[in-house]
């Protein structure tokens, strides 16, 4: 078995868990390859002394990898897909962050997790991905034109609203007067979209949700659409530029830009340990069914 490991940051209190993970993988004779910057942080903090093979970019990974560990929070998983893209390498998130909707493995469960992986006591959840195209083409977006959670447009350098004209499959839908607009996948429905009043969508649902950010017209509600819908956006406002975000990546676009958002031709595979499920994660993370009044 061969695995990749990626982390954005190295926190002192996470050092022992990183060491525990590497030791557990070594015990099972699993080949480990670590992202170069994260490996440098591990060596700098003297977590381990031995050398590991490393990778730096998407081009250095291939289908020979059986698994990809993301160490951090949900933001780290979102950055992990920059390395995975369409390689179909399953991602498993070890949560050393806070909420952890995607990074569902707690750091205290590492040894048990490795045992489950070795004995194949896990399932794969296929998650849809969004891709964005712009006319004219944006160099800022480049090859990173995809998102696991959401693609959003936001105002820039102004406190005034922007107007987002929206078409679905070339049919006019609405002009949103708002701070911005979110197009989220089912995976992203528990993130930015949820905080703006959007619904929770079960991951395997073939749907997307369009959620306005602080709309001027309170009748502008989130809209759930089929995931094979082509979404076209045109932005106007007092400023000549606006922001577009693809998960954690941001690009500045001019108001002359036309955006097209579609479901990508590939999916991201997420590892789910038995008997974990999305519904259990909802109950744990959102405290559903718990009475905290006393």
Tell where the protein language model's regions lie, with residue ranges:
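Short aromatic-centered micro-motifs
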Residues: 166, 188, 244
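Gly/Ser-rich helix-loop-strand patches that form or flank binding pockets
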Residues: 79, 83-96, 101
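Catalytic core of DAGKc-family lipid kinases
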Residues: 98-179
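Short gly/pro/ser/thr-enriched loop/turn and capping motifs at secondary-structure boundaries
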Residues: 41, 97-102, 200-201, 216-218
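ATP/NTP phosphate-donor binding region
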Residues: 1-67, 108-123, 134-145
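Short glycine/serine/threonine-rich phosphate/pyrophosphate-binding segments
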Residues: 14-15, 75-80, 190-195
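Gly/Ser/Thr-rich active-site loops/lids in small-molecule metabolic enzymes
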Residues: 174-219
């Amino acid at each position: 078995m061969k695995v990749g490991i990626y982390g954005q940051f190295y926190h002192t209190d996470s050092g022992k868990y990183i060491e525990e993970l590497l030791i557990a993988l070594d015990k099972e004779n699993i080949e480990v390859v670590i992202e170069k910057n994260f490996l440098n942080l591990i060596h700098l903090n003297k977590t381990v002394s031995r050398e590991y093979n490393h990778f730096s970019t998407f081009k250095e990974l291939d289908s020979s990898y059986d698994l990809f560990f993301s160490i951090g929070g949900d933001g780290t998983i979102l950055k992990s897909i920059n390395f995975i893209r369409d390689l179909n390498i399953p991602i498993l998130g070890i949560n050393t962050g806070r909420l952890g909707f995607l990074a569902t493995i707690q750091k205290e469960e590492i040894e048990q997790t490795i045992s489950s992986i070795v004995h194949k006591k896990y399932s794969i959840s296929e998650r849809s991905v969004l891709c964005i195209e712009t006319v004219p083409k944006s160099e800022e977006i480049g090859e990173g034109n995809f998102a696991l959670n959401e693609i959003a447009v936001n105002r820039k350098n102004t406190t005034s609203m922007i107007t987002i004209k929206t078409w679905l499959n070339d049919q006019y839908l609405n002009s949103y007067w708002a701070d911005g607009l979110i197009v989220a996948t089912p995976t992203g429905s528990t993130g930015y979209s949820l905080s703006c009043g959007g619904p929770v969508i079960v991951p395997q649902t073939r749907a997307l949700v369009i959620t306005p950010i602080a709309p001027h017209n309170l009748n502008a509600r989130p809209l759930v659409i089929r995931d094979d819908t082509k979404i076209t956006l045109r932005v106007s406002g007092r400023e000549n530029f606006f922001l577009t975000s693809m998960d954690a990546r941001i690009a500045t676009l001019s108001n002359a830009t036309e955006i097209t958002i579609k479901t990508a031709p590939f999916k991201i595979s997420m590892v789910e340990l038995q008997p974990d499920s999305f519904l259990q994660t909802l109950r744990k993370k959102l405290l559903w069914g718990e009475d905290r009044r006393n």
